[in-house]
Structure formats: structure tokens, C-alpha cells
């Protein structure tokens, strides 16, 4: 039988900080020697690109494509050494492959401001839940995430889905005002954990957070408006990271500003994944190609159930589930605003 505790729906966004930490959690945190992770303020939606900026970027892209096409034409007609074709032809095909990658990149990013962000939702009759799958994360990781999830605005339930079946996690979740759920076996890992929760919870929309991703209070307020379109199944937000000592941020200092080195807030905004989450992902909205990135996403439960739940056949259950949703005619959206921050 699944184990679950605490059936209280979180009605007050400010009540989480009043919950004491359980004694076992305090001991675990002290023994780890690691501080509880801070919760940084979130980012904001980037301003729309100006017409002049778009024109310059598109002009440079077209110039690059034209130059590349002329170069490949010259290579094919005058430069490929057919006397040594076993070297020359594969090399030429690699160059063609690179050019096609540039063309596809330009095509997908030609227009990125295609879906205006809806106004924040201040009240809703929908049933909401935040799901936090966990297996072996320590208290210094779980505590900030659970506390912040309980404090997310709009009435909702917070569920800690513990595949580690740890009594202290149940104690921590209960103390912070969250519900606790475990299962007898860890079949299909995270995907199976989420599918098990879908059989238990009563929700119209769920926010899925990795155990190390701390949500910001407006996670639901800024994303629920997209679901006014009954075809929308998923809203994905950027993945961002608040610890500055990881490989994600190791190149931040080489990015200079007019004032010199980046300050901490600028370093927080810069990581290895900035190109994808701030440039490439927004361009996918035009083609209904946004996909679930595993965390920081809000999903329509009815859509998940329509495709048989979270895909379990591969370890990339997020993208696989998105493919299933698209196959069934559902739409997906990328909301280009940081609404959760994690540990890299």
C-alpha cells in the first residue's frame, strides 16, 4: 500500500516559514556540514526584441547562410579532390552537415516572440499540486525545495514523492505542511514515481520539480494563464541555478560587462545552458516544439492521462512524454521566465 501523510491543502502562501524543522532534519543538516541553500529572487520576462535588433540579427544570419552556400558550391565544383575521394568526400559531407545545422538553427529562431505571456492568475478554481520526486537527496537539498513549494501562491497541495522511503523525509514534509507519498518498489525510477502519484493525487494541474529545484512564489500565477487554451498540455520554464561554484558557471567570469567582471546576480543569470534556455527554447514556441525539460514545468493532468501517463520506455521520459503529447494533438509552451532555481 502507498504511504501518505497530511491531507491539508496549502491555503496560505506565507505559512511555510512558520513550520519548525524536525529534530532529525536538524541533526542530518548539522552532520552534513552543508548550509541550507539560499533562495534567490527570480528573473523576469525579457523585453521583446526591437525591430532594429531583429533586422540586424536576421541580416547577419542571412549573410552567413549566403556565404556558406557559396563556399559549399565552390568546394563542390573546384575544391573536392576526387583523386582521394575517401578523404575529400567525407570531409565535404561534414561541411554540408555543419551548414545544414546553421540553416536549421536560423530557421527555428527566425521569430521567437510568438506567444505573449498571459497576465498572472490571482485566483482559480482548478485543483493544483506541486510534485517533488526524491530518492536520496539530503535535508540541505530537500528542505528549501519543500518549504518554497508549500509557499507557492494559489491554493495547492505539495507532495513529496519519496522513492527512498525515509522516515525523516516524511517527518520533514509533515512539519513543513506538505504531503508524503512512497511506494513499495522503485519501478521505472522518476517516471514511475510520478505515475504512481497520478494514481493518488486529485489535481487538474501539476508542477513537477526536481528535489534540488526551489520554486518561486509565482510558479502557478505566471503559468496557469496559458492553460486557458484547452489544447495546452505543458508549460516549461527555464532551468536556472543559484550556486556559483559549479561547472555551469565556471566560464561566467570571462564574460565581461562594461564595468568589468560580472557581479553575483549577473553570474546567476549566466550558465552553460543560457544559450538553450534563453535563446533556443523560446524559438520553439512558433513551431509548437517546446518540450518538457524534467523540472520547472506545469502540466495538465488530463493530458498526461490521455497519453498513458509519463513515458517509462526511456530514461528521457520528459522528451518522450512530450512526443506523445504532440502525437495526440496537444500543444506545448515555453515561458521564458525563471520560476525555479536549482543546484548545478
Q: Where do the language-model regions lie?
A:
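A conserved acidic beta->alpha catalytic loop
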Residues: 162-169, 185-186
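Catalytic donor-sugar/metal-binding loop of nucleotide-sugar-dependent glycosyltransferases
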Residues: 313, 322-340
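Cell-envelope/extracellular polymer assembly enzymes that use nucleotide-activated donors
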Residues: 126-129, 157, 305, 320
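Long helical/loop segments within the catalytic core of UDP-sugar-dependent glycosyltransferases
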Residues: 108, 181-205, 217-315, 326-327
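N-terminal membrane-anchoring/stem segments of glycan-assembly enzymes
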Residues: 2-122, 173
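Active-site beta-to-alpha loop of glycosyltransferases that engages the nucleotide-sugar donor
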Residues: 130-146, 164
Amino acid at each position: 500500500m502507498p504511504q501518505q501523510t497530511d491531507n491539508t491543502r496549502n491555503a496560505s502562501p506565507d505559512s511555510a516559514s512558520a513550520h519548525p524543522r524536525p529534530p532529525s532534519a536538524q541533526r542530518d543538516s548539522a552532520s552534513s556540514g552543508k548550509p541550507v541553500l539560499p533562495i534567490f529572487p527570480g528573473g523576469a520576462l525579457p523585453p521583446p526584441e526591437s525591430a532594429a535588433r531583429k533586422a540586424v540579427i536576421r541580416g547577419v544570419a542571412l549573410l552567413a547562410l549566403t556565404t556558406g552556400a557559396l563556399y559549399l558550391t565552390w568546394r563542390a565544383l573546384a575544391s573536392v579532390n576526387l583523386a582521394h575521394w575517401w578523404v575529400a568526400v567525407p570531409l565535404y559531407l561534414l561541411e554540408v552537415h555543419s551548414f545544414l545545422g546553421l540553416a536549421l538553427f536560423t530557421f527555428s529562431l527566425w521569430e521567437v516572440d510568438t506567444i505573449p505571456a498571459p497576465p498572472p492568475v490571482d485566483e482559480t478554481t482548478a485543483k493544483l499540486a506541486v510534485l517533488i520526486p526524491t530518492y536520496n537527496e539530503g535535508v540541505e537539498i530537500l528542505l528549501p525545495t519543500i518549504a518554497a513549494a508549500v509557499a507557492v501562491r494559489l491554493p495547492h497541495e505539495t507532495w513529496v514523492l519519496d522513492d527512498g522511503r525515509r522516515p525523516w523525509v516524511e517527518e520533514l514534509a509533515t512539519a513543513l505542511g506538505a504531503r508524503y507519498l512512497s511506494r513499495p518498489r522503485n519501478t521505472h525510477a522518476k517516471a514511475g514515481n510520478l505515475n504512481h502519484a497520478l494514481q493518488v493525487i486529485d489535481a487538474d494541474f501539476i508542477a513537477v520539480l526536481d528535489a534540488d529545484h526551489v520554486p518561486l512564489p509565482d510558479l502557478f500565477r505566471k503559468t496557469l494563464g496559458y492553460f486557458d487554451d484547452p489544447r495546452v498540455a505543458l508549460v516549461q520554464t527555464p532551468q536556472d541555478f543559484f550556486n556559483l561554484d559549479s561547472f555551469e558557471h565556471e566560464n561566467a567570469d570571462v564574460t565581461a560587462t562594461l564595468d568589468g567582471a560580472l557581479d553575483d546576480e549577473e553570474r546567476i543569470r549566466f550558465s552553460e545552458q543560457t544559450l538553450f534556455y534563453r535563446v533556443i527554447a523560446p524559438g520553439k514556441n512558433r513551431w509548437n516544439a517546446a518540450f518538457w525539460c524534467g523540472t520547472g514545468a506545469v502540466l495538465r493532468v488530463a493530458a498526461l492521462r490521455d497519453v498513458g501517463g509519463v513515458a517509462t520506455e526511456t530514461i528521457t521520459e520528459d522528451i518522450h512524454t512530450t512526443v506523445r503529447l504532440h502525437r495526440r494533438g496537444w500543444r506545448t509552451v515555453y515561458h521564458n521566465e525563471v520560476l525555479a532555481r536549482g543546484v548545478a
